[in-house]
UniProtKB/Swiss-Prot annotation:
Pfam families: Death, TNFR_c6. It comes from Bos taurus. SMART domains: DEATH (SM00005), TNFR (SM00208). This is Tumor necrosis factor receptor superfamily member 1A. One of its GO terms (biological process) is defense response. The gene is TNFRSF1A. The lineage of its organism: Eukaryota, Metazoa, Chordata, Craniata, Vertebrata.
Length: 471
């Protein structure tokens, strides 16, 4: 028969045997042996331990950095201790049978090695600068960056085991260690931390202002546009290009320039032509011959096949046709218009018919001068690239040139004709001669063009001979 089973006595007998099998000899110094539980009140002083085979013997413990190799052989004898091998350590006095393995810092937790492992100290791991430790359990931790408190100020700086504590600005609330905008508040907890939102300007704006403001802007723009138009029509320096479009007038007269000759109301359509008796003529040096082939500038219609269009609001450009022209000749009052001396203020006086007949060219030449074909011959004889130079030399201003170009649009030939006609109207009658045009063309080295104009006029008279009036 076996031993009687007594529940109260079985556990103390079985437990030491189980513990002896579970705990190996290498960890006997770390985990107390079951027999030590009964011998805690051992007479061994501090720094010594009971001999495992003889409880009456007290052996000295090994210093840190060493481990127990053999127990002391007897009382008063030294314990055999050995130094820990590399990669192992013991940090306290002990009677361990082997040293403990050194720990390693964990890179996945962003740990860094503060100090390496030595025989009497384990590896010391920590965090980098501006990081703190977030622990789980007693020893495990990971490193996290300290909060910089954006949208707030630092209340308590970052420490080894604690993140920065921030104080948020107005309009932000603290969530964890970050200041979050109150616009992102979606629960009642953050509503307690966020102040009441002030009403925006749009909510408090008067509804009448929304309607009145656009009206004020539109009225201001209209007023500015009207003032610009008035200034453009009033001041001379803005007139040249805008005067004829905005103000409805096409003729500009500058101060100091002769006024354009415009027929008075009720003027008889039949024109009385009066010529100066003393046209000016002076010898002119002839420059070298320069070819002036008009074919390079495009085909131009024959002067005799076209007539000048009426000038826009500027009065008649040319005299009437030869059939309606009355010359200053003696005759009965019912058939002709006699030229009589004008008032003293008049600058152009008609000469007696007998004296004019003695000094003026023949009637065909006069009619040719008064015919629009004469001006068209000059227009067709001068290259378009040199035309503005010609009218500038004749005394036409830049504003007048630009205005006539603007009025005639893309009709270059009609614009040139209008420039020449404007020069005729502004020039005294005794000076507006073909001889003057000839001198200007010679100064421009366009002698070939001058010959072409003479040929176009039929060769009845040379431009260098007796002056021929363009009136």
């Amino acid at each position: 028969m076996g031993l009687p089973t007594v529940p109260g006595l079985l556990l103390p007998l079985v437990l030491p045997a189980l513990l002896a099998d579970v705990y190996p000899a290498g960890v006997q110094g770390l985990v107390p042996h079951p027999g030590d539980l009964e011998k805690r009140e051992s007479p061994c002083p501090q720094g010594k331990y009971n001999h495992p085979q003889n409880s009456t013997i007290c052996c000295t413990k090994c210093h840190k950095g060493t481990y127990l190799y053999n127990d002391c052989p007897g009382p008063g004898r030294d314990t055999d201790c050995r130094v820990c091998a590399p990669g192992t350590y013991t940090a306290l006095e002990n009677h361990l049978r082997r040293c403990l393995s050194c720990s390693r810092c964990r890179d996945e937790m962003f740990q860094v090695e503060i100090s390496p492992c030595v025989v009497d100290r384990d590896t010391v791991c920590g965090c980098r600068k501006n990081q703190y430790r977030e622990y789980w359990g007693e020893t495990g931790f990971r490193c996290l960056n300290c909060s910089l408190c954006p949208n707030g100020t630092v209340n308590i700086p970052c420490q080894e085991r604690q993140d920065t504590i921030c104080h948020c600005h107005m309009g932000f609330f603290l969530k964890g260690a970050k200041c979050i905008s109150c616009h992102d508040c979606k629960n009642k907890e953050c509503e307690k931390l966020c102040p009441t939102r002030p009403s925006t300007g749009k909510d408090s704006q008067d509804p009448g202002t929304t309607v009145l403001l656009p009206l004020v802007i539109v009225f201001g723009l209209c007023l500015a546009s009207f003032a610009s138009v008035v200034l453009a029509c009033r001041y001379q320096r803005w007139k040249p290009k805008l005067y004829s479009i905005i103000c409805g007038q096409s003729t500009l007269v500058k101060e100091g320039e002769p006024e354009l000759l415009v027929p008075a109301p009720g003027f008889n359509p039949t024109t009385t032509i009066c010529f100066s008796s003393t046209p000016s003529s002076s010898p002119v040096s002839i420059p070298p011959y320069i070819s002036c082939d008009r074919s390079n500038f495009g085909a131009v219609a024959s002067p005799s096949s076209e007539t000048a269009p009426p000038h826009l609001k500027a009065g008649p450009i040319l005299p009437g046709p030869p059939a309606s022209t009355h010359l200053c000749t003696p005759g009965p009052p019912a058939s002709t218009h006699l030229c009589t001396p004008g008032p003293p203020a008049s600058t152009h006086l008609c000469t007696p018919v007998q004296k004019w007949e003695a000094s003026a060219p023949s009637a065909p030449d006069q009619l040719a001068d008064a015919d629009p074909a004469t001006l068209y011959a000059v227009v067709d004889g001068v290259p378009p690239s040199r035309w503005k130079e010609l009218v500038r030399r004749l005394g036409l201003s830049e504003h007048e040139i630009e205005r006539l170009e603007l009025e005639n649009g893309r009709h270059l030939r009609e614009a040139q004709y209008s420039m020449l006609a404007a020069w005729r109207r502004r020039t005294p009658r005794r000076e507006a001669t073909l001889e003057l045009l000839g001198r200007v063309l010679r100064d421009m080295d366009l002698l070939g063009c001058l010959e072409n104009i003479e040929e176009a006029l039929g060769g009845a008279a040379r431009l260098a001979s007796e002056p021929r009036l363009l009136w």
